[in-house]
């Protein structure tokens, strides 16, 4: 049986979008309470009854988020000089894919109403 599961992670960060016009509100430094959905897919392990232990996903994602993104200015993170949701989701994919077999998508929730989903290279 093929399944997909997701785990949501949260972090706080500031950013500004340097490519938008100076009068655009996102050109100014501002912050978000980001939520990140990390989804993996694959065949259910019939013996265990699951695809993967959620703790295994957490052990990969949480240290990276806390060390590299939480309470940071995302513009200062190498590779995120223009930290749109689209760029952030791709950046996360590149960091996580080598460590999460079956990675299916990364969804970045910038607000409760605005999100971007990236499904791989």
Annotated model-derived regions:
Residues 1-121:
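Charge-rich, low-complexity N-terminal segments
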């Amino acid at each position: 049986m093929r399944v997909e599961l997701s785990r949501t992670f949260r972090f706080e960060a500031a950013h500004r979008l340097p490519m938008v016009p100076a009068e655009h509100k996102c050109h100014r430094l501002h912050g978000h309470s980001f939520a990140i959905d990390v989804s993996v897919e694959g065949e259910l392990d019939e013996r265990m009854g699951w695809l993967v232990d959620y703790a295994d996903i957490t052990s990969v994602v949480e240290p990276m988020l806390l060390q590299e993104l939480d309470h940071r200015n995302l513009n200062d993170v190498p590779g995120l000089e223009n930290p749109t949701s689209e760029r952030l989701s791709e950046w996360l994919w590149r960091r996580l894919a080598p460590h999460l077999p079956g990675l299916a998508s990364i969804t970045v929730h910038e607000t409760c109403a605005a999100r971007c989903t990236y499904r791989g290279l």
